[in-house]
Amino acid sequence: HRVHRRQRQMCIRDRHTTGDKILDRPLSEVGGKGLFMKDIEKALVAGHIDAAVHSMKDVETFLNPKTTIGCILPREEVNDAFISNSSESLKDLPYGSIIGTSSVRRVGLIKNHRPDVKTVLFRGNINTRLQKLDNREVDATILAVAGLRRVGLVNRITQKFTLEEIPPAIGQGAIGVQCRLPKCKADEEILNWISKVNHRESAICVESERAMLGALDGSCQTPIAGFSKLTQEEKITLKGFVISPDGTKIYSESDTSSQADAAKLGQEIGQRLLVKAGSDLVR
């Protein structure tokens, strides 16, 4: 696709990543959520592309040091949604029902609410997962509201979870653009251009959440969740969670700081959770 705007020309290249191709195994077994961005990041660093667009919940904890997030677009709703053709909510599912999900976070949280429920691997895009649900391979699934909205399928939502019921993934609902750190005038111009569409409020929240993730050194094997909110008087509140894979334990920490200290707040929350949960859970 080619887009012309203000005398600039962009060539948009669609790329299928390794994460899109390996669908028969959990992400934690094949390299983690970074599989959705590694191929694109390599192309960025090599200079084959000038910017990479990511769902921030799929972005690795630590970026390639030659790159940065140039902007965060206005964030969508961060909640998760329960989808079923037979039950109105998670609590209404019959005993021993099967829920399809590929997320260790969702598995832990589901088990916390419904220890009797069985979870099975559920990979693929939104349409693929919903087709599996409609084919009765599972009784229900859980997906991000933001993802459903982007493909026009919010009508499939049976129950929207509150942030406390099923806390979201770090960065959920946010789209970010990764750029090279400038080493030449062209890179500097690209970063400057992209930064002009940065949504300040969304960027502050994502920065705080990812700082928490960094303090925990969280990977796809660790059930970690969290959400942040800007409040009056230039404040930000962050709440983070570490969940045991079997759902028997949930550790949480929350606090408020100035928006200027958003990253510091995230680091502090992460360090507190690390002490609470211990290295047996955070790995």
PLM region spans:
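Short helix-initiation/N-cap motifs at beta->coil->alpha
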Residues: 15-20, 32-40, 119-131, 261
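Single conserved hydrophobic/aromatic residue that forms the stacking wall/gate
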Residues: 1-8, 12
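Pocket-lining segment of extracytoplasmic ligand-binding domains
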Residues: 119-208
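Alpha-to-beta junction loops
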Residues: 45-54, 58, 136-146
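A conserved helix-loop-strand patch within extracytoplasmic ligand-binding domains
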Residues: 56-59, 65-117, 180
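A C-terminal functional module that forms or caps the active site or interfaces directly
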Residues: 203-273
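Short loop->beta-strand "edge-of-pocket" segments that line small-molecule binding or catalytic clefts
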Residues: 5-6, 91-102, 195-203
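Short, structured active-site "lid" loops
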Residues: 24-50
